[in-house]
């Protein structure tokens, strides 16, 4: 029941997450890890990545531009009042406000390594950049991948606050394969598939089921269990496929 689809008639939730800052713990001083100001800190000139996304970049720059006002408000406001202020600042854009935000982004531009949408993960994993405006799922994925390179990454939500976003499935009205689109969405919303998708991407599924809740709290789940590829509709594995699984396990060390 969101304002863009009050009766849930046109969209199906897919994934959700947060926007925050991913950083290299060996290169960024802990004292700098607290607010959005890290993205404007010239101590890390040419090592900062910013999202080539108007929604995210303008949102963050707006909060940064009004950081002193928000800092004072946080001392006396209730959580609801503070949230309402953030919402007003970021959703009601005036010409004066936009000019102020543009100034902050132009100032930041001189110290950036790059603007990016997807390549930032690799830049962080390879140690080319130290600071990245990141979506939570990308951060989860990159933190794990970076360990193989001996690089330690972490992720935090700045103290001024951030936003929670949702990705949704929709079917264009001019689609020629509506039935297939529905089947695909149903497939992706199956709890078992949603679990495996979540494990692969690092993002949190919007599908809620007891199985998913149990999975998210079970530390012993094998993330590399691919036996589902060989199961029939009832979850059974034939003798032929079982032999194939054992062959790949023995011959190639693949953990099916």
Summary of predicted features, one role per range:
Residues 1-125:
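Extracytoplasmic ligand-binding site segments that recognize negatively charged/polar headgroups
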Residues 123, 227-256:
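Conserved C-terminal helix/tail region of periplasmic/extracytoplasmic solute-binding proteins
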Residues 19, 27-29, 54-58, 137-140, ...:
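Solvent-exposed loop/turn segments at secondary-structure junctions
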Residues 162-163, 167-232:
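Mature extracytoplasmic/periplasmic domains
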Residues 133-151:
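A ligand-binding cleft/hinge motif common to bilobed small-molecule-binding domains
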Residues 44-48, 109-110, 127-130, 148-153, ...:
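Loop/turn elements at helix/coil->beta-strand transitions in domains of secreted/extracellular proteins
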Residues 113-114, 130-135:
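Paired acidic/hydrophobic, glycine-rich loop segments that form the ligand-binding mouth/hinge
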């Amino acid at each position: 029941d969101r304002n863009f689809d009050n009766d849930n008639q046109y969209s199906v939730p897919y994934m959700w997450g947060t926007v925050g800052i991913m950083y290299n713990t060996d290169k960024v001083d802990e004292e700098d890890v607290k607010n959005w100001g890290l993205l404007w800190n010239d101590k890390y000139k040419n090592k900062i990545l910013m999202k080539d996304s108007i929604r995210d970049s303008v949102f963050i720059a707006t909060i940064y531009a009004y950081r002193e006002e928000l800092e004072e408000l946080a001392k006396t406001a209730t959580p609801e009042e503070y949230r309402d202020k953030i919402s007003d600042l970021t959703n009601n854009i005036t010409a004066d406000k936009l000019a102020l935000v543009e100034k902050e982004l132009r100032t930041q531009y001189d110290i950036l390594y790059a603007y990016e949408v997807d390549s930032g993960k690799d830049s962080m994993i390879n140690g080319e950049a130290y600071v990245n405006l990141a979506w939570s799922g990308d951060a989860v994925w990159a933190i794990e991948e970076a360990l193989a390179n001996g690089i330690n990454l972490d992720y935090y939500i700045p103290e001024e606050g951030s936003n929670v976003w949702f990705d949704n499935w929709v079917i264009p009205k001019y689609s020629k394969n509506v039935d297939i689109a529905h089947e695909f969405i149903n497939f992706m919303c199956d709890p078992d598939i949603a679990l495996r998708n979540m494990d692969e991407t690092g993002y949190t599924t919007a599908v809620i089921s007891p199985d998913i809740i149990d999975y998210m709290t079970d530390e012993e789940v094998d993330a590399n269990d691919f036996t589902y590829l060989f199961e029939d509709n009832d979850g059974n594995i034939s003798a032929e496929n079982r032999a194939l699984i054992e062959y790949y396990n023995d011959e190639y060390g693949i953990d099916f």
